[in-house]
Structure formats: structure tokens, C-alpha cells
């Protein structure tokens, strides 16, 4: 990707092509008075920093993150919605909606090298801001690992999205669910614009939220309960049939028996024509499978990445970096007693425990390459986390970045996740390229953001739907080890796909 983003096309508040109305003098002055930091304070900060975050409070409790995204991002425009939905009580504090982000053009080279150029040297500290207040949002596809290691690619190309894609986002709507505030934010860059120019962007964002009609699809109708037919695979085309997948599992076990790897994560893709709007897919996925990482990334031109990932790949705040592997799976059961029995079964399963410990060790090694010696610690080990359709064993690994290393170095070291590739990672990926018929694309990669100040938070791209060329694609995998049962591993791919299949069926039924 290039290090300079082109100017975004102008739009009117409805999202149609046209010129943007400039605030008149009175409106501009009122907006400046409502903006924090105020003009004089921002000028003082601008003398010391490259970027000054500005914000206004938006007073309209009828706007939600989902409706704001639908209002601000037309069906063929670039935009994003990032949320965290709690799965077991509590409040997930922030949701972010990007307004008119600028796509970064791909260069064909190392995507992380290009991303580093978008980090500001210094971002002004402004009290009371959310953690992410602008930067770059996007994904690294699984095959982007070829820029970091000498790796082969599977023969077939993935569905029609670029290998990696990022959007430069200076203008945001931020929902603070703890304080029930909505903030309109922009990054003021004093070297290339005036304070009034930055405030004018907030004014246009305010207008767009107030004047755009709410989409009919978000009428508040209750969502019907899912049925077994919702997550069936009838009408879907698989890139590996059950027989083909189980045959690949047998071949993976042969590699493991030969000492080539300890674990190999094999996946299969399901595809079908899409007869619903991508925004409705996200709405239904959010309802059926709330997850710590929820995202709808629109690349424009009818291309979307919509997901509900449970798993952190890398998060870096200051010098502290974390990864959180999930490995070991059981389906959820509606009967609490049976659900508890499945949890006990998961905790006692020696195969699942051994697989999980192996992947925790892989995470420790990944962080160890970029952290100070002796700082890598396992904060918690093998807790059970429940999601709507499955439960997983979860652990958290933490370290302190070494001098001269940054968050993007940690992302490079951990990418792709061992939980989506195997161990040892490089050899497992070589075997995956041999056994899977197509490149994975987004699946198994990572999606998240790099803040202008360096804050980095990337989830593993799983439980993720790709929309391209009028089709929707879902993909799920299973970790193959020496004693894997091929039929059980196939069933695991179905369990992991259920939430996405349900979201598609329900969105189409409501269309």
C-alpha cells in the first residue's frame, strides 16, 4: 500500500456524489466554541505535537452504532464499524464508526512497512478521549505472511478481495457506552490544515448524522429465534466436501506421524449468492453471536468483511503487548446442566489441553522475539470462555516490548495466529498450502486498527464473512493432531460456522 492516501471523493450528507457544503461564519464559530480543545489550547498543543485530536459531543440518543454506520456509509462506499459486545455481562465501553475513511492503495510489498509511515511522531494528550481516536483500520489476509516468511501459496485465489486492505481514518463517531455519550472526532494536523478546516469536518459529520434518513432495515423489529434449519448448509457450495475434508485430515495426520508438525489447522469454505444487505448480515451476526471483536469493514464496490471474532491476536498499549490464544472447543447446549457437563468434558480432555498448552507456548515464543528478556508471562491459563454457539479454552500471554521494537513488530512476529495455522507454524503453513485447494484470503489473517499514537489492537479473522461479487463466503477450521478423528474434526468446522450460517439465513429471511 502507498504511504500517501488520495483525497476522498466529496459527498453530500446523504452520501451521494456532490460538493460538501462549507459551514457559514456563524455556524463555524459556534462549532469552534463547542470543540475541545478550544482554538487557543489546540494552538498551544500544535506547537508541540504533529496531531491534535478534536471532538464535540453529539446530543441525540436516537442514534446507535449500527444505525450510524448505515447512515454514514453508503452501500458502495468505504467505511467501518468496530464494536465489542460483552458475552457474559458487563459493559463493552466503546464503538467506533469511521466517516469517509480513505482507502490506502496496495503496493504489493510488505503491508506493515507501509502502515508504519502513518504513525504520527507525536499525538497531543487530550483528557477524556477513547483509546482509539483515529489512525488506520483494516485487515491482513492470511497470505500476507509471505511478506514476513518464505512461504508457498495455495493454488486457487481467494474470493475477490485484496490480500490486505487498510483505510486511513481521521473522522470518527465514537459511542461511549459507559457514560452514554456520543463523540464526533477528527484528527487536526496543523502542518497541513487550519483549526477551522478540522472543525468544518466535524460540522459535516454532525450534519450527516442528523439529516440522513434511518434505514428501514433498522426498525427495531425483534429478531426471531434461530432454528436448526438456520445453520444448515443446504444451498451452500463447499470448496471441500465432507469426504475431501476427512481425506485431507488423514493426510495431515500422516505428516504429523512423520514428524513434520505437531498440529495442522485445516479449514473449508462455504459460499452462496447473497440475497440480503451486508448491513443486515452484521445486525443478525451481532444478535446471534456477540463477541469481543465485532466488525463491519466496507471497502467499497460491494466488498465487505463482517465478523464476530472471539480471539485477540495482538494488543499493544505503550510498551505492554498481549496475545490471547483460544484452543479447545465444545459446542454450547441450551440446557445449563448439559452445558456444564460439556465444560467439564472440555477441561478434562487431554488432547484439547495438550493442544492448548502447545499454542500457548507458541504465543510465548512469538512475543519473546520482540520483548525484553524475562518479561513474557502467562497471565491466565486455560479458562473456559463461552460464546453463543461454542465454548473455548482461553489463556493470556503478556510481555514488554524491547527497546527499538514497536507494536507492528509484535504483530509481524505473531502473524498469523498459531491457533489458525498450527505448530511449528512455518511447517504447518507449508502443509496447509499443500492440502487446502484455495488461498484463505481474509480467513486466518487479522483485522483491527493502528492508532495514530501507536495503540494497536488486532483480532484473528475468524467467525468472519466475506462479501464480494454478489456472494457471501464463510470459512472455519479444525486443529488436527496425531489422534484426531476425521469425522469429529469435520463436525467442528460445522459448529464454528453455525453463527455465520444463521446470520445469513435470518438476514435473507428478513429481506
Curated annotation (Swiss-Prot):
Origin species:
Streptomyces coelicolor (strain ATCC BAA-471 / A3(2) / M145)
Judged by the first EC level, this protein's enzyme class is lyase
Report which reactions are catalysed by this protein. chorismate + L-glutamine = anthranilate + pyruvate + L-glutamate + H(+)
**Keywords attached to this entry:** Amino-acid biosynthesis, Aromatic amino acid biosynthesis, Lyase, Magnesium, Metal-binding, Tryptophan biosynthesis
Describe the function of this protein: Part of a heterotetrameric complex that catalyzes the two-step biosynthesis of anthranilate, an intermediate in the biosynthesis of L-tryptophan. In the first step, the glutamine-binding beta subunit (TrpG) of anthranilate synthase (AS) provides the glutamine amidotransferase activity which generates ammonia as a substrate that, along with chorismate, is used in the second step, catalyzed by the large alpha subunit of AS (TrpE) to produce anthranilate. In the absence of TrpG, TrpE can synthesize anthranilate directly from chorismate and high concentrations of ammonia.
Name the positions where Mg(2+) binds.
Answer: 355, 492
Q: What is this protein called?
A: Anthranilate synthase component 1
Per the similarity annotation, which family is this? Answer: Belongs to the anthranilate synthase component I family.
Amino acid at each position: 500500500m502507498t504511504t500517501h492516501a488520495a483525497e476522498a471523493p466529496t459527498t453530500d450528507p446523504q452520501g451521494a456524489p456532490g460538493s460538501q457544503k462549507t459551514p457559514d461564519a456563524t455556524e463555524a464559530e459556534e462549532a469552534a466554541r463547542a470543540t475541545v480543545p478550544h482554538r487557543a489550547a489546540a494552538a498551544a498543543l500544535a506547537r508541540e505535537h504533529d496531531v491534535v485530536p478534536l471532538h464535540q459531543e453529539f446530543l441525540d440518543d436516537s442514534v446507535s452504532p449500527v444505525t450510524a454506520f448505515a447512515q454514514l456509509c453508503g452501500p458502495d462506499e468505504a467505511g467501518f464499524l468496530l464494536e465489542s459486545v460483552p458475552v457474559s455481562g458487563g459493559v463493552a465501553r466503546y464503538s467506533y464508526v469511521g466517516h469517509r475513511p480513505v482507502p490506502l492503495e496496495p503496493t504489493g510489498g510488505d503491508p506493515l512497512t507501509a502502515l508504519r509511515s502513518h504513525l504520527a511522531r507525536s499525538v497531543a494528550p487530550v483528557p477524556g478521549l477513547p483509546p482509539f481516536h483515529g489512525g488506520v483500520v483494516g485487515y491482513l489476509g492470511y497470505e500476507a505472511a509471505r511478506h514476513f516468511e518464505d512461504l508457498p501459496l495455495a493454488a486457487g485465489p481467494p474470493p475477490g478481495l485484496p490480500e490486505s486492505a487498510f483505510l486511513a481514518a481521521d473522522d470518527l463517531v465514537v459511542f461511549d457506552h459507559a457514560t452514554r455519550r456520543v463523540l464526533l472526532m477528527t484528527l487536526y494536523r496543523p502542518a497541513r490544515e487550519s483549526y477551522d478546516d478540522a472543525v468544518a469536518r466535524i460540522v459535516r459529520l454532525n450534519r450527516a448524522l442528523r439529516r440522513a434518513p434511518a434505514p428501514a432495515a433498522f426498525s427495531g423489529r425483534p429478531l426471531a429465534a434461530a432454528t436448526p434449519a438456520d445453520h444448515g448448509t443446504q444451498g451452500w457450495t463447499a470448496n471441500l466436501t465432507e469426504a475431501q475434508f476427512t481425506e485431507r485430515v488423514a493426510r495431515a495426520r500422516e505428516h504429523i506421524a512423520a514428524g513434520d508438525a505437531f498440529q495442522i489447522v485445516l479449514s473449508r469454505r462455504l459460499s452462496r449468492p447473497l440475497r440480503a444487505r451486508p448491513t443486515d448480515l452484521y445486525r443478525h451476526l451481532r444478535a446471534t453471536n456477540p463477541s469481543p471483536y465485532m466488525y463491519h469493514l466496507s471497502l467499497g464496490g460491494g466488498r465487505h468483511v463482517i465478523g464476530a471474532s472471539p480471539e485477540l491476536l495482538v494488543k499493544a498499549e505503550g510498551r505492554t503487548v498481549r496475545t490471547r490464544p483460544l484452543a479447545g472447543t465444545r459446542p454450547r447446549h441450551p440446557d445449563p446442566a448439559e452445558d456444564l457437563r460439556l465444560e467439564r468434558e472440555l477441561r478434562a480432555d487431554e488432547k484439547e489441553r495438550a493442544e492448548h498448552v502447545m499454542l500457548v507456548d507458541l504465543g510465548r515464543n512469538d512475543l519473546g522475539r520482540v520483548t525484553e528478556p524475562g518479561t513474557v508471562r502467562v497471565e491466565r491459563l486455560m479458562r473456559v470462555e463461552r460464546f453463543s454457539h461454542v465454548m473455548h479454552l482461553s489463556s493470556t500471554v503478556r510481555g514488554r516490548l524491547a527497546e527499538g521494537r514497536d507494536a507492528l513488530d509484535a504483530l509481524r512476529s505473531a502473524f498469523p495466529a498459531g491457533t489458525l495455522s498450527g505448530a511449528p507454524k512455518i511447517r504447518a503453513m507449508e502443509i496447509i498450502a499443500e492440502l487446502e485447494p484455495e488461498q484463505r484470503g481474509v480467513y486466518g489473517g487479522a483485522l483491527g486498527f493502528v492508532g495514530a499514537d501507536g495503540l494497536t489492537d488486532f483480532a484473528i479473522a475468524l467467525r468472519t464473512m466475506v462479501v464480494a461479487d454478489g456472494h457471501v463466503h464463510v470459512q472455519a477450521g479444525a486443529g488436527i493432531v496425531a489422534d484426531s478423528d476425521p469425522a469429529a474434526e469435520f463436525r467442528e468446522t460445522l459448529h464454528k460456522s453455525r453463527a455465520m450460517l444463521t446470520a445469513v439465513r435470518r438476514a435473507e429471511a428478513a429481506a
